[in-house]
C-alpha cells in the first residue's frame, strides 16, 4: 500500500541496500567500470587543476619576466593540461554511455518483475488496490528510479570522490583558506538539511497525489458513458479539480523549497569564492607561507569545484528520497505473497482404451482429473463430469465479516443451476469460490468428488468457462479476442465458435471482418455484440463447466434472443452456474437458488418456487427488486 501523504520510506537504508544489491547482481561489472571511469574523470580534473599552479608559477610568470620569449615550454605544459582534461572527457563520456544501458536494463528488469508478480497475485489484491495506483508504479515510480539510477547515483559518487580529492589538494595548497572554505560549506549543509527536509516531505506528498490523480483519470475514462448518461460532467470536473489542486499544492511546495535551495547554495558558494580570493590575494602578495599566485589560482578553482558537488548533493537528495519512496512501493508489490496453490490434481485430455481412462495428447472432448499419488501408486484418472457439491460452506472476504452462511447445494453433471437474489445476496461470491478466486473459511467444495483445494488452480479454472456481465476485450483483432479462450485454436475453430455463439453475422459486417482491430475495450461494439464475443471466447475453450453472469438486462430484445440462443448452445451438456438478472432466462433451469444475506432461503424449479409463493414468487411477480 502507499505511504501516508507526506511520509517518507520507512527504512531508506534497507531500500538503498536492496536496490544496490539488484544493480550489482544484474550489472555488477558495468557498475564497477562506471565507478572506475568516474574516479579517472575526477582525478584527471584534479590533476589538471593542480598543474595550474606550476603552469602559472613555473611557466607563465617567468615568461612574463623574461626578455627573450620562448613559448615552447609553455605550449608543452598546456599540452599536458589538455591531456589531463581529455582523459577526463573520455572517462565521462564512457560512464554516461554505460549508465544509459544500465538504467534502461534495470527499468526493464523492474517492469518484468512487477508484471510477473502481478500475474501471480490473487484477485483479492486487485479488489483492494486502485488500478490507477498500480499503474502509477509502472509509470511515475519507475521514472523516479530512472532519474536516480541514471543521474543521482553517478553524480553522488562523482561528488563524493570530488570532495575527497579536492579536500586533500586544498590542504596541500593552503590550510587557512581550506578552513574558511569548510566554514562556508558548514553553513550550506545546515541550510540543505533544513530546507531539504521540508522539500522531501512535500515531494513524497506529490508522489501520492500523482497516483491519486492517475487513478481518478483512469476511472473516469472507463466510466465516461455513465458520466454522460447522468450528466455529471460538472461534478466529475469539480472532483478532479480538488484532486488536481492538492497535487498542484504539494508540487508547488516541493519545488518551491527545492528551487530555493540551489540558488542559496550557489550564492553562498560565490561568497566563499570571493572571501578566499580576498584572503588568498593578501597571502599571495605577502608570500605568506610560500603561497604564490599560481597556488591562489589553483585554490580558487578547487573552491569552485568543492562547492559545486555540495550543491549537487543538495539537489539530488530530493530525487533520491522520491526514488526510494517509489522503490518502496515497487518492492512492496514484489514482496506481496503470490496466490497460494497447494493443489496437485491436474486436468488432462483423456480417451478410453480397453474400458480404462488414459491421458491423450490430443483434444478428444473427454476430460479427466489426473490424481498423482505420493506413495508411488500409478496415477488415477477420474472422468470430469461436472458434479459440483457445496457442503456447509462459510465464507467472508474478511475473517470478521462472514457473507455466506452454511451454504449447501449440489449440481449434477449437465445441470443448469441459477442464482437469484438482491444485490449483495452472495450470487457472485459463490461463483468466485467455485473457481477459487477466494478460499472458504469453513466447509468443503467438491468437484467430481475431489476437494477443490487438491486441484491445481490453473487446471480448475481451465475446466470452467466464464462469461462475465462486463466483457473485457483486448486491443487486438476480433479473431485474437476469441482465440484468447484457447491460444492454439485454428482460424477455422475460431469461426466455428463465433457461429455457435451467433456472432459470425455481425463480425463479417465489420470493416475487416474477423481481422478488425478493437480499441478502447471494444467501445464501438454494442453490449450485445460484446456479450456474443464473450460467448464465442468461452466456446473456443470448450470447457466442461460454465459460469454465466447474464447481461441480457442491457440489450435489445432481438440481440437478447441471439445471446440467449448462443448461451443455450454453449450450455448444452455442460454443468452451468448462472447469475440471473432476468427471471425469464432461467425458467428452464434444473434448480434455482434464491439467496438472501448470504443464505439459500429457497431452492427448486421455476414451477416449484412459484407454488411456494415465497421470495422467488415476489421477485417474479414484481413485488421485490432483483439485481
Where are these regions (language model features)?
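Membrane-integrated ABC transporters
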Residues: 1-45, 60-81, 95-99, 103, ...
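Juxtamembrane helix-loop junctions of ABC transporter transmembrane domains
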Residues: 5-13, 44-60, 83-131, 135, ...
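Transmembrane helices of ABC transporter permease
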Residues: 26, 30-43, 84, 90, ...
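Helix-loop-helix
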Residues: 62, 169-183, 253, 257-328, ...
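ABC-type nucleotide-binding domain
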Residues: 67-68, 350-627
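Conserved catalytic Walker-motif region of ABC-type ATPase nucleotide-binding domains
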Residues: 118, 240, 390-392
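Hydrophobic patch in the ABC ATPase nucleotide-binding domain
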Residues: 123, 226, 336-339, 494, ...
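An intracellular "coupling" helix at the cytosolic face of ABC transporter transmembrane type-1 domains
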Residues: 123-124, 142-149, 153, 157, ...
Amino acid at each position: 500500500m502507499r505511504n501516508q501523504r507526506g511520509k517518507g520510506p520507512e527504512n531508506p537504508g534497507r531500500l538503498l541496500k536492496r536496490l544496490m544489491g539488484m544493480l550489482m547482481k544484474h550489472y555488477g561489472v558495468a557498475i564497477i567500470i562506471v565507478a572506475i571511469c568516474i574516479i579517472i574523470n575526477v582525478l584527471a580534473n584534479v590533476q589538471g587543476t593542480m598543474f595550474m599552479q606550476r603552469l602559472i608559477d613555473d611557466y607563465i610568470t617567468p615568461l612574463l619576466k623574461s626578455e627573450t620569449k620562448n613559448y615552447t615550454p609553455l605550449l608543452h605544459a598546456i599540452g599536458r593540461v589538455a591531456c589531463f582534461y581529455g582523459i577526463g572527457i573520455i572517462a565521462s563520456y564512457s560512464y554516461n554511455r554505460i549508465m544509459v544501458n544500465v538504467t534502461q536494463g534495470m527499468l526493464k528488469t523492474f517492469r518484468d518483475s512487477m508484471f510477473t508478480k502481478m500475474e501471480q497475485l490473487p484477485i483479492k489484491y486487485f479488489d483492494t488496490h486502485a488500478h490507477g495506483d498500480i499503474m502509477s508504479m509502472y509509470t511515475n515510480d519507475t521514472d523516479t528510479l530512472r532519474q536516480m539510477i541514471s543521474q543521482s547515483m553517478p553524480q553522488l559518487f562523482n561528488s563524493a570522490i570530488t570532495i575527497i580529492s579536492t579536500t586533500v589538494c586544498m590542504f596541500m595548497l593552503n590550510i587557512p583558506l581550506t578552513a574558511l572554505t569548510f566554514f562556508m560549506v558548514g553553513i550550506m549543509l545546515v541550510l540543505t538539511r533544513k530546507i531539504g527536509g521540508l522539500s522531501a516531505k512535500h515531494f513524497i506528498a506529490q508522489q501520492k497525489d500523482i497516483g491519486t490523480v492517475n487513478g481518478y483519470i483512469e476511472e473516469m475514462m472507463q466510466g465516461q458513458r455513465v458520466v454522460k448518461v447522468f450528466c455529471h460532467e460538472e461534478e466529475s470536473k469539480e472532483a478532479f479539480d480538488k484532486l488536481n489542486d492538492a497535487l498542484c499544492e504539494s508540487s508547488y511546495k516541493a519545488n518551491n523549497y527545492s528551487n530555493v535551495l540551489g540558488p542559496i547554495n550557489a550564492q553562498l558558494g560565490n561568497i566563499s569564492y570571493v572571501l578566499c580570493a580576498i584572503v588568498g590575494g593578501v597571502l599571495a602578495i605577502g608570500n605568506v607561507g610560500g603561497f604564490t599566485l599560481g597556488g591562489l589560482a589553483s585554490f580558487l578553482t578547487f573552491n569552485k569545484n568543492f562547492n559545486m558537488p555540495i550543491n549537487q548533493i543538495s539537489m539530488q537528495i530530493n530525487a533520491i528520497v522520491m526514488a526510494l519512496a517509489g522503490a518502496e512501493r515497487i518492492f512492496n508489490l514484489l514482496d506481496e505473497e503470490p496466490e497460494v496453490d497447494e493443489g496437485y490434481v491436474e486436468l488432462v485430455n483423456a480417451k478410453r482404451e480397453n474400458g480404462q481412462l488414459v491421458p491423450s495428447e490430443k483434444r478428444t472432448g473427454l476430460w479427466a482429473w489426473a490424481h498423482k499419488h505420493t506413495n508411488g501408486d500409478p496415477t488415477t484418472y477420474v472422468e470430469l463430469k461436472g458434479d459440483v457439491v457445496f457442503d456447509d460452506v462459510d465464507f467472508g472476504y474478511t475473517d470478521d465479516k462472514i457473507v455466506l452462511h452454511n451454504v449447501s447445494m449440489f449440481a449434477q453433471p449437465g445441470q443448469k443451476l441459477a442464482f437469484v437474489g438482491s444485490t449483495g445476496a452472495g450470487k457472485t461470491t459463490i461463483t468466485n469460490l467455485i473457481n477459487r478466486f477466494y478460499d472458504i473459511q469453513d466447509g468443503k467444495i467438491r468437484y467430481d468428488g475431489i476437494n477443490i483445494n487438491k486441484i491445481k488452480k490453473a487446471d480448475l479454472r481451465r475446466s470452467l468457462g466464464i462469461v462475465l456481465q462486463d466483457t473485457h476485450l483486448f486491443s487486438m483483432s476480433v479473431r485474437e479476442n476469441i482465440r484468447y479462450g484457447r491460444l492454439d485454436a485454428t482460424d477455422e475453430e475460431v469461426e466455428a465458435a463465433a457461429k455457435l455463439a451467433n456472432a459470425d453475422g455481425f463480425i463479417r459486417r465489420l470493416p475487416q471482418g474477423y481481422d478488425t482491430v478493437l480499441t478502447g475495450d471494444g467501445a464501438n461494439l454494442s453490449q450485445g455484440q460484446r456479450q456474443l464475443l464473450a460467448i464465442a471466447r468461452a466456446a473456443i475453450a470448450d470447457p466442461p463447466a460454465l459460469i454465466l453472469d447474464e447481461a441480457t438486462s442491457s440489450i435489445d430484445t432481438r440481440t437478447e434472443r441471439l445471446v440467449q440462443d448462443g448461451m443455450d448452445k454453449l450450455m448444452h451438456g455442460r454443468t452451468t452456474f448462472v447469475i440471473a438478472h432476468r427471471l425469464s432466462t432461467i425458467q428452464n433451469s434444473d434448480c434455482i437458488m434464491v439467496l438472501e444475506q448470504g443464505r439459500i432461503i429457497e431452492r427448486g424449479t421455476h414451477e416449484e418456487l412459484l407454488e411456494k409463493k415465497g421470495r422467488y414468487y415476489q421477485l417474479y411477480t414484481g413485488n421485490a427488486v432483483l439485481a
